[in-house]
Amino acid sequence: MKASEISSQKIMDSIRPLPEAGKQEQSSAERALLPPEMEAAGLSLFMDGDALTLTDGTNTLCGDFTRMKKRLREANLRQELLVKAARIKSLQDDRKPVILDATAGLGEDSMLLAAAGHQVELYERDPVIAALLADALRRAAEDPALAEAAGRMHLHSGDSEAAMREYAQRMHRETTKKSEICLQNKEDVKAEEKCAETQKRDSDQAGMNGDETADAELTAIDIIYLDPMFPGRHKSGLVGKKFQLLQQLESPCADEEELMQAALAAEPAKIIIKRPAKGPYLAGRKPSYSLMGKTVRYDCLVFPENHHV
């Protein structure tokens, strides 16, 4: 069975608790349904207590938001560079921008954004990583200190590039439809002005059509967040031997230009790109500005014409 044929839900459904005798005695029947290449590498998934866990027989890794609680305190959140990067001043009613995290991983960056009040749509293409993240979100939803933020995080197991392009197409279709309705309404208004006394019924109907246009408006994505795997480096927050487990599943970004073009096609008001502090720009695209940390920086591409107010 190919990795593409195994969904995160199938993986979750196939999980069995770890036998009391320990990891090494776990039979093949008790292991999760995994891609053949993962099993060949000696990796397996099991339930360690309440947590879905990835192991190579020596090291283990699971999604865990509980260790982030200190960072999620309001005073600390305000100092997070990513939270600062996600600000857009021109939105109406001081609402928080809606964010699409196109490279979710284990979701730690998205948790920061959700704790800051953002709705976050998370995309993770690797089914095993998506399963680890889904399990972490399940446990977070049961933790009073994390439940509110977890409730703003919506996980999609799949290819974010395809999702962003499909979103762009939907927005284009909706914009075209709205433009056609608006044009028709304007033509109706002109006709009404010429024969207001004899065509009042047509005038009333045109007004009704205008109301329907507002109701059909799609919820827009304001910000797209990209944190692709950088060759020779790794995502911040995952270090040492535990990271090596995840690295066997998640490969460096194969085509930076394709990822960037998919994000641009969705026409967000801002694209935020997480990079190593001294790393090159993603796809060679110079940002509008950058926020620099000790080990990482956030390159921000701003598109005022795309602000969804």
How does the language model describe each region?
Residues 1-96, 132-178, 185, 211-218:
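S-adenosyl-L-methionine
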Residues 6-29, 168-220:
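Intrinsically disordered, low-complexity terminal tails and inter-domain linkers enriched
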Residues 98-100, 104-145, 157-158:
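SAM cofactor-binding core of SAM-dependent methyltransferases
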Residues 99-112, 220-240:
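Conserved proline-anchored active-site loop of SAM-dependent methyltransferases
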Residues 163-166, 170-171, 251-264:
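A short, acidic, amphipathic alpha-helical segment used as a generic capping/interface helix at domain edges
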Residues 228-259:
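Mobile active-site "lid"/loop adjacent to the S-adenosyl-L-methionine
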Residues 256-302:
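Conserved Class I SAM-dependent methyltransferase catalytic core
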